[in-house]
Amino acid sequence: MRTAKDIIELLLELEHGIADDLEDQDLDFKQWDAQSRDKAVKTLVQMAVCMANGGGGTVVLGVADRVQGRANAILGVPPEIDINLLKKAVYDQTDPKITPVFEDLSVPEGTGRLILMRIYP
């Protein structure tokens, strides 16, 4: 499982590459859909299911996965998004129930906030 420190180190690589190239079976980067909170939550639930089916992993919310340059790729997650509500949404919309662990990660780019969602096997 990736730690916040691991993610911070990986984000440095965005200066010379794209997040999609950093992804693997247990790591995914997703842009937060700022236009539709419902769509963003639906995507989050889908990612939780994918990670659970794949044996667990970490999803980094707030990073465009096909954009080069750290400042361009890190868009962030709006500060009003409540991680407790995200956790409840994933739990309520999955069967069997998935209980993700969320963590805020401060960054200087975008909204200044990324969210890490960890799914344990």
Q: Which sequence ranges carry the predicted segments?
A:
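Conserved N-terminal catalytic/coupling substructures associated with nucleotide/phosphate chemistry
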Residues: 1-121
